[in-house]
Curated annotation (Swiss-Prot):
It holds the Pfam family PGI. Coiled coil: none annotated. CDD domains: SIS_PGI_1 (cd05015), SIS_PGI_2 (cd05016). Keywords: Cytoplasm, Gluconeogenesis, Glycolysis, Isomerase. Its EC number is 5.3.1.9. It is found in: Cytoplasm. InterPro entries: G6P_Isomerase, Phosphoglucose_isomerase_CS, SIS_dom_sf, SIS_PGI_1, SIS_PGI_2. GO terms for cellular component: cytosol. The gene is pgi. SUPFAM superfamilies: SIS domain (SSF53697). The active site is at E349, H378, K480. This is Glucose-6-phosphate isomerase. Belongs to the GPI family. Gene3D superfamilies: Glucose-6-phosphate isomerase like protein, domain 1 (3.40.50.10490).
Length: 551
């Protein structure tokens, strides 16, 4: 019996009997490998994307065992898309799927809001590139300084590195950290071009410290040059946030909306990812269309015919449902070099949870790392092949090569890249090491949208399999609170030492009655290293010998 699933251009054909009786993985039997490849291969003809999980050690019994779990997972994802409170800890809907198909939103107001934002972003990007919107000095904008942390930085960085071509659109620079040296280098590289630079600050709440600090540094440098901040400043934030109110008060050049129901790590199809794409002349409609097509393909409620469920099942079995294997991401295309970092946040922030939904301590997670092939073959692939077997590889390939790099002496660089990928995949399999492969006929905005959407859905399904909330981040919030406590402690230490009296870390702790001696040592080590008038007497190798004062 055959099943045919038609979802627009999507067509998957599978023989149920064959699927349920495919042979187990064999490292040495090429015929068995070929059978598994045929039985487990998924293909989307219109997108030109293949998913091959045949080199993962999943078997027919695993599919049978996971069937009921996936039935529940598919229902949960359907409810999520219909507007259920999927993030129960924060009592929020999870609506990133609506961003590429606004008609799926639970009400017309949300649908219209999404569609309007896409139009505004597209028009703004075009007008900036074409010079209809100019810098305050009357010149065309030449650069963008993008200020954002986490998903507000990684998503835009992926869009730029993956999709920008030489001399296309504006040049991009990033403040994605609060490292003073990093900020100094970016501002130094911009130089006088800061006067023709759009400064985009991204913060959902409008109160995140890192973007605020970066924004103030950019503002100070621009105003010191005699620039006009408001005429170059753009905000991407929620309506009525602190940042939104500031932008309105100061009449910034433009404001774009973020939505309460979209988390940072799934915000790439919102203004967070679309605005940078528009500013390099990228077809944002194609990017959204690719994501929407993959969403359709991953709504199929059949484990064997849904690429996201195939991938989630392979992850689950590889790590015994406990994340016992790392995911090593190996994209064989320089444009996707940032993709492993993007997946680190998407996967690890979503799945790395201490508690399940029932309050049980589970310590779930799936570690992700990687760079790009074939570079990695000359780095850590040695350990993957011969070292500890605690991972599975995710190969990503693009079949179509660019035309302006010709064959020289009948040697095509793309042939070597393909050979290196196949060779590494084969070498890992021969060693009994697991891998899956995603292949794309070509790479463009549409395929990037599809690739992102595939992993988003796989993460959502995996979260359902292990019964965790994949849409909150209590560990991140704990880190923010701890950082705020340290900054508060530093302020109190500085207030105490303002009297000029020399004190040890222990004495400071005794007077303040908060923090710890170790935290105070760290604070004072930093302060004394930065010429703020603090001195230390004693041996830095013996912390208890040190006495601190304000000179």
């Amino acid at each position: 019996m055959s099943r045919h699933f038609d979802r627009g251009s999507f067509r998957a054909v599978s023989d149920v009997h064959q699927l349920m009786s495919f042979p187990d993985f064999s490292a040495s039997d090429a015929h068995v490998q070929w059978q598994r490849f045929n039985n487990l291969l998924w293909h989307h003809n219109d997108l030109g994307i293949w998913l091959d999980i045949s080199r993962m050690h999943i078997n027919a019994e695993d599919f049978e065992r996971l069937g009921p779990r996936f039935d529940q997972a598919f229902k949960a994802m359907q409810a999520l898309e219909q507007g259920a409170i999927a993030n129960t800890d924060e009592q929020r809907m999870v609506g990133h799927y609506w961003l590429r198909q606004p008609q799926l939103a639970p009400d017309q107001e949300v649908c219209d809001h999404i569609a309007k934002e896409i139009d505004l972003i597209e028009t703004f990007g075009s007008n900036v590139i074409n010079g209809l919107i100019k810098a305050p000095n009357g010149k065309k904008f030449t650069d963008v300084l993008w200020i954002g942390i986490g998903g507000s930085g990684l998503g835009p960085l992926l869009m730029i590195r993956a999709l920008q071509n030489a001399e296309q659109g504006l040049r991009f620079h990033f403040f994605d950290n609060v490292d003073p040296d990093g900020m100094s280098r970016v501002l130094g590289n911009l130089g006088d071009a800061l006067s023709t630079t759009l400064v985009v600050t991204v913060s959902k709440s409008g109160a995140t410290p890192e973007p605020h600090l970066g924004m103030e540094q950019a503002r100070q440098r621009l105003e010191a040059m005699g620039g006009h901040w408001a005429g170059q400043a753009v905000a991407v934030t929620m309506l009525n946030s602190q940042l939104d109110q500031l932008a309105q008060k100061e009449s910034w050049l433009k404001r774009f909306d973020m939505f309460d129901w979209v988390g940072g790590r799934t915000s790439i199809t919102s203004a967070v990812g679309l605005l940078p794409a528009a500013l390099i002349g990228c077809d944002i409609r194609a990017f959204l269309a690719g994501a929407a097509q993959m969403d359709e393909a991953t709504r199929v409620s059949d484990l064997h015919s849904n690429p996201a469920s195939l991938m989630a099942a392979a992850w689950f079995v590889a790590g015994d449902g406990l994340g016992r294997r790392d995911m090593v991401v190996l994209p064989y295309r320089d444009r996707l070099e940032v993709f492993s970092r993007y997946l680190q946040q998407l996967v690890m922030e979503s799945l790395g949870k201490r508690l399940d939904r029932d309050g049980n301590v589970v310590h779930q997670g799936l570690a992700v790392y990687g760079n790009k092939g074939s570079t990695d073959q000359h780095a850590y692939v040695q350990q993957l092949r011969d070292g500890v077997d605690n991972f599975f590889a995710t190969f990503i390939e693009v079949l179509e090569d660019v035309e302006n790099i010709p064959a020289i002496n009948n040697e095509h660089p793309g042939d070597f890249l393909d050979g290196f990928l196949q060779g590494t995949r084969a070498a890992l399999s021969q060693g009994g090491r697991q891998s899956l492969t995603i292949s794309m006929r070509r790479f463009d905005p549409r395929r990037l949208g599809a690739l992102v959407a595939l992993f988003e859905r796989a993460v959502g399904l995996y979260g359902e399999l292990v019964n965790i909330n994949a849409y909150h981040q209590p560990g991140v919030e704990s880190g923010k609170k701890a950082a705020a406590a340290i900054l508060n402690l530093q302020s109190r230490v500085e207030d105490l030492l303002a009297d000029g009296v020399e004190r040890s870390a222990g004495e400071i702790h005794q007077v303040i009655g908060d923090g710890s001696e170790e935290a105070i040592f760290w604070i004072m080590r930093h302060l004394t290293a930065n010429k703020r008038g603090y001195v230390a007497e004693g041996d830095w190798g013996i912390p208890t010998s040190l006495r601190f004062s304000k000179g």
